[in-house]
Amino acid sequence: MHLKLYWKLQKKERPLEVSRDTLRTPMSHGKANGDVKARASYMKPTVLPSASLVKASSRKPFGILSPNVLCSMSGKSPVENSLNVKAKKNVLSAAVHQSEEGLPGTWAIVKPGNTKEKIAFFAAHQYSNRIGSMKIKSSWDIDGRATKRRKKSGDLKKAKLQLEMMREINSQCYQSEPFVCGVEHCSVHYMSDSGDGVCAARPLSVIQMVAFLEQKATALLASCTKNCTNSPAIVKISGQSRGIPPAPEPFSAPETCEEPKEQENPETGRSQGEPVRVLDMVARLESECLKHQGQREPGSLSRNNSFRRNVGRVLLTNGSQASDKSEEGSADTADPQENPLQPVSVGEEPSVTEHHSVGEQAWDGTSQSCPSLPATVSFHMDSTDLEPGQQTAMKSCSRDDVEMVEEFDELPTDAVRRIRRELVTVTKHSPEQRQDPLCISITVCTVEKDRPAALDSLEEPLPGMLFFLSSGQDQQAHPQLREHPAPEASEASQPQDAAEGSSAGEEKDASVEPLLPAASPGGSTSQVLEAATCKKQVSQDFLETRFKIQQLLEPQQYMACLPHHIIVKIFRLLPTLSLAILKCTCRYFKSIIEYYNIRPADSRWVRDPRYREDPCKQCKKKYVKGDVSLCRWHPKPYCQALPYGPGYWMCCHQSQKGFPGCKLGLHDNHWLPACHSFNRAIHKKTRGSETEEEY
């Protein structure tokens, strides 16, 4: 029984409310269009207040329900203009208390995601004398906080102007000091330097941080140039030994001062409209922070050690390439006899090793002719040119280290002469650095220019030479490399050192390469002769024993020479086990067995063509041409007669399966056709549903 529907009376203050009952009744098309137009007309004044809003001030559309903080607008009624902020707060609180009796208060503070926010949309237009018929920009402006998704772009012009001023200042400077403070101090100083700051109420952006860092670098430029003018080139070793404390370094390296300059020049040379390379500045800042951290904790290992070594490697390579051109004059002032000799590595150790005394190898001064080295070069010196009694202290060189220091108790005479010549030039150029004694070991390695490039790569030794060379023969193999007469030292030492330098540039293991041709003709002929005599030192018993073993391991080719008909006759006399072994070991025999269908002498497979396709009753396998599998040739003394068809042979009864003489799981198709004609009709009826017993 359905109730009769009646029209619901509506007030004039609620023109937008349409009950569910009215929706069920038939409505004309024009009335529906007018309702949509009316709804659109009431939603428009929420965006732009107009005269229609003043006329229908009592009507409250849906759009005015969201704000929590009220603000003044131009389209208010005179009653609303007379109210101040306190009156608004009183009305707001009164609305909250008034909602206890009827519907929930519309102007209560609605949190995001609260259910009251949905209810407030339907309960709003019942309170006609409520304030706030205007749209407020943000509904979350409580306690005077700034809007979440709005950015103040007014101060961006000030930042750009200040950034251009910093670029103009940096274009005039030539060097910059490493940054003393990190990013965490950047915002504090930047806010305190200027009175109000660029943006005093919010954190600084990356562009402002970069501008601040450039300003700091310019301010500290004068002190850096004073300290760096008189200091010589000191190459700082990135990875230091753990047990040895490093010596203090009073002067900063000029390579580190020149490196930011080389990176800032392309920045300042650009047009002022382009943005700053923030990645370059941040990478430079991180490298400097890590450098200062390494100076505070010199010997400690931290998680940033690998990153610190990589940053130091980049700084050293760039700085050494820049300082290489300015230091060519000091390198050319050496002895003219050393022009073909190129120094490969100049090592510097900040402390003296325990194996050596300070007085033997300590000189006051540093080298001015430090060549530019790639960061991935690792040098391994060959110790064959030294005496057996010499002690060698080596510092291991990894890929991240820039240089490797080698110290020797006694060097060859020609190398000592060159070291003394270079030390004279070194001490003349740097008299200021005599304050800190440094232990320097200079390894002079020479490379001959006209040497073929094929000898530079490491040659593979002959096979078997590792067992024939002993330690005594190794010392006799290079007698000419160590002993040279005094008058020939100036001439013959250069090709000799060329051979040593080529071996020093290569990475070598503990075993020494026996056939490394030297530059001198006398040494090369002696090495070739000694390498030829190494093969004659093997005993005759060893050669005879090895020949006998090789003869035993060689396959015998007698069977392969026989014709096929003879091989087939031989195979038919073999048992199944022997034939299966021959088939598995040789492909030639396998092809013969399968092609000629050779059966073993003790095979139990039925040769009758009627049962050729009949499978085994238990393993369900059919006979294949040349099949010698072990599961089909055992004798089956017992016959299992089935009532519905032919029986089959089996190796044992089910009760005898546990006996050791039983051949478990080995069956063939040699079955007995007992009562075959008698049980044919029964066999046809039960063929589809028969289940055979498996023993």
UniProtKB/Swiss-Prot annotation:
Pfam families: F-box. It comes from the Eukaryota. InterPro entries: F-box-like_dom_sf, F-box_dom, FBXO34/46. Keywords: Ubl conjugation pathway. It comes from Mus musculus (Mouse). Residues 556-608 form the F-box domain. This is F-box only protein 34. Substrate-recognition component of the SCF (SKP1-CUL1-F-box protein)-type E3 ubiquitin ligase complex. Residues 239-275, 316-373, 472-524 are annotated as: Disordered. Directly interacts with SKP1 and CUL1.
